[in-house]
Amino acid sequence: MSMTPREIVHELNRHIIGQDDAKRAVAIALRNRWRRMQLPAELRAEVTPKNILMIGPTGVGKTEIARRLARLANAPFIKVEATKFTEVGYVGRDVESIIRDLADAAVKMLREQEIQKVKYRAEDAAEERILDALLPAARPAMGFGDEPAREDSNTRQLFRKRLREGQLDDKEIDIEVADNPAGVEIMAPPGMEEMTNQLQNLFSGMSKGKKKTRKLKVADALKMIRDEEAARLVNEEELKARALEAVEQHGIVFIDEIDKIAKRANAGGADVSREGVQRDLLPLIEGCTVNTKLGMVKTDHILFIASGAFHLSKPSDLVPELQGRLPIRVELKALSPNDFERILTEPHASLTEQYRELLKTEGLGIEFAEDGIKRLAEIAWQVNEKTENIGARRLHTLLERLLEEVSFSAADLASEHSDKPIRIDAGYVNSHLGELAEDEDLSRYIL
């Protein structure tokens, strides 16, 4: 990951509108990871990541920033909700399962990368096994010359050509494949995931290496053997060692809804999943060792990004130790009508583009006029102000409502509008949404 903070922000701008402060904070945090890896080993061990706390209303881009960041970093990433966890000793998931899930994510990510690297070798090996099943074993050369061997080679090349062209896809063959019995599914009680994982691994290991002959179509057999050969070519021990390093040095954990575990000043009663969870998170964020399938994972250099709306509580309601472990505070702003307008048009694969392309599959064209987009943005902002502010998610509700009739009758409308697309202008938006937006009671329940 050698992108500069400016390049990271530029990439985030393709998908997320506004929130420049948050983008700069995460870009610097990501670049600092690269900078740390350039340091001498002795100094590198001393440099710890500066964890981030994002504060802002729902639907303004907190989660999306973290999600896009993980894709850019090509790093093990996991998003969890703080409300899913309970204090150790109570029924529910304990916070250490976050690191175990992160380790699983790292293995999955690296395995996919390794399989891509050996893809062509796996395809060649699968092709040879299919040809072995299609053709009898080569006859031993009898008498003088190698005429039969050459004849077999020519036949094999002919079948190889037909196989690659897909002419043999529907032909059935008997092929020996790895025996993968249906996995033993164990419903894990909350907090017992680690034990059930070990039991499942035990049962799956019992049938490892066993083969069985199956009758399959060539196309299905080719895919199955390709996957089997790719898995065989991947060095599992090396993969696990690399995954362990990736988790420890590059892992990113995004903890959403952290405001929901903040103790409110006037709240009473038990705090099984509030203050207790905060105290359990402390060692994880500060740096501790967690036992996982990959071995012992040190969390000292994992980057933690926490986020919350904090509309019923304040960041100061978190326990002081946790506040200290989230030193970088970033406030995300509520969206303005202009932001809504930009969200509808500017991002890569914007909402308007998605609907346009979806309806194009039915042969129906739609065109969003500038005044239509402006009016839609105004309505989204108005409804958010009058009712609950759910940020950019309001646009999904409005667009579904706006295009409901068009989506329902798309196949019928396609023939009527074959030469001219349906134009979504301010008048169209007002006729479909204006009345609902003005009536507060209706908008509260429908929009």
Swiss-Prot record:
The keyword ATP-binding is assigned to this record: yes
Record GO terms (molecular function): ATP binding; ATP hydrolysis activity; peptidase activity; proteasome-activating activity
A GO cellular-component term linked to this record: HslUV protease complex
Gene Ontology BP terms: protein unfolding; proteolysis involved in protein catabolic process
Main location as per UniProt: cytoplasm
CDD domains named in the record: RecA-like_HslU (cd19498)
Keywords attached to this entry: ATP-binding, Chaperone, Cytoplasm, Nucleotide-binding, Stress response
Subcellular compartments: Cytoplasm
Disulfide bonds: none
Claim: Hydrolase is one of the keywords in the record: no
InterPro entries per UniProt: AAA+_ATPase, ATP-dep_Clp_protease_ClpX, ATPase_AAA_core, Clp_ATPase_C, HslU, P-loop_NTPase
Residues holding ATP: I17, G59, V60, G61, K62, T63, E64, D256, E321, R393
Self-association and partners: A double ring-shaped homohexamer of HslV is capped on each side by a ring-shaped HslU homohexamer. The assembly of the HslU/HslV complex is dependent on binding of ATP.
Function: ATPase subunit of a proteasome-like degradation complex; this subunit has chaperone activity. The binding of ATP and its subsequent hydrolysis by HslU are essential for unfolding of protein substrates subsequently hydrolyzed by HslV. HslU recognizes the N-terminal part of its protein substrates and unfolds these before they are guided to HslV for hydrolysis.
NCBIfam families: hslU, PRK05201.1
HAMAP family the UniProt entry points to: HslU
Family to which this protein belongs: Belongs to the ClpX chaperone family. HslU subfamily.
Record-given protein name: ATP-dependent protease ATPase subunit HslU
Source species of the chain: Pseudomonas paraeruginosa (strain DSM 24068 / PA7)
